[in-house]
Design a protein with these regions (language model features):
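Extracytoplasmic and endomembrane cell-envelope/extracellular-matrix remodeling and assembly machinery
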Residues: 1-33, 37-38, 77, 82-85, ...
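Short, surface-exposed glycine/acidic/tryptophan-bearing loops
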Residues: 58-79, 244-246
Length: 307
């Protein structure tokens, strides 16, 4: 009864969670593999339900992107490529490895902080702190532990900080709720047909290449390539930039491994981006100098032809 006043209900999310469960069928096996190889608990596979509804295309109003909702600066710190042609935050596998690196560091950092206050604290007791740090930040949780000790309920009820507000306090509870529903999806939603895990093989490009050439050589549609290569930006898909050399191009898995097509691609002349002008529709969050950098022109020159 005392806790009843603290219970919060979220309505209107049934269809969204059903869609997330289908996506979970597509990306969940890969996420579980990454977590296992990283030495992290398998329960973390339910975190993207809270972050993005398991959508690799998700964007937040503050600039976080992808399955794991990674901010640009954080992504670069975690080793992801973010430039005009590639944004690995949108690649579910690359982003999952980055998230795993973040969570491993969080676990290590918060364990040190917690055991400085209580040497007998267990990894299980630290799990809520690690999960919450994904929303609040490692340093924020470290400060909370330093001030209140490694008692999560005490931190939730008594810790005071300008940014430690309702959304942060509810984050772990939301994670537990998502885990419960995902584990018991038949009870809540009946039979849901999960998405099929992606099957692909990787070709490391030894040169820059246009998306048009890839489509032509391999006989693949833009839609087929987009599903497997979500990290490529709109500048590539519109033909304004080439796919960079060294990029790990994903292709549908085939028994012959596309041998003839790969050989043909490597025999073709090198491509260079065509000159001239292009039209670009400005989107929310764009800046003039950011667009200029994407097209490799001087910001001042962009102003000159548009003013």
């Amino acid at each position: 009864r005392r806790a009843a006043g603290d219970i919060r209900c979220l309505s209107g999310s049934r269809d969204g969670f059903t869609t997330a469960l289908r996506r979970f069928g597509t990306y969940g096996p890969m996420v579980r593999r990454v977590l296992k190889d990283s030495g992290l608990h398998s329960d973390i596979q339910y975190l993207p339900f809270v972050e993005s509804s398991y959508s690799p295309k998700a964007y937040s109003r503050v600039g976080a992107a992808g399955l794991w909702q990674i901010m640009p600066a954080t992504g670069r710190d975690l080793g992801l490529v973010l430039n005009a042609t590639v944004d690995e935050r949108l690649d579910p596998e690359a982003a999952s490895w980055a998230a795993a690196r973040y969570l491993k560091n969080a676990r290590k950092t918060l364990t040190v902080a917690a055991r400085a206050k209580n040497s007998k604290v267990s990894s299980r007791e630290l799990s809520p702190f690690v999960i919450t740090s994904y929303n609040y930040g490692v340093n924020g949780m470290r400060r909370a532990i330093k001030k209140m000790g490694p008692d999560y309920i005490q931190v939730i009820n008594q810790y005071r900080s300008r940014k430690f507000q309702v959304a942060v306090k509810n984050f772990y509870a939301g994670f537990l709720a998502a885990r419960h529903v995902a584990r018991n999806q038949k009870q809540f939603f009946g039979d849901i047909k999960p998405g099929r895990p992606l099957q692909y093989q990787t070709l490391i490009l030894d040169r820059q290449v246009s998306i048009a050439r890839v489509q032509s050589v391999f006989g693949l549609s833009e839609a087929e390539l987009k599903v497997l290569n979500p990290a490529l930006t709109r500048f590539v898909w519109h033909g304004w930039r080439l796919i960079p050399d060294g990029y790990k191009l994903r292709l549908p898995r085939r028994q012959d491994s596309w041998r003839n097509q790969v050989a043909r691609l490597r025999m073709m002349p090198f491509e260079t981006r065509q000159g001239g002008s292009v039209e670009y529709t400005v989107r929310t969050g764009d800046t003039a100098c950011g667009i200029a950098a994407a097209f490799r022109v001087v910001c001042r020159a962009l102003f000159a032809v548009n003013c």
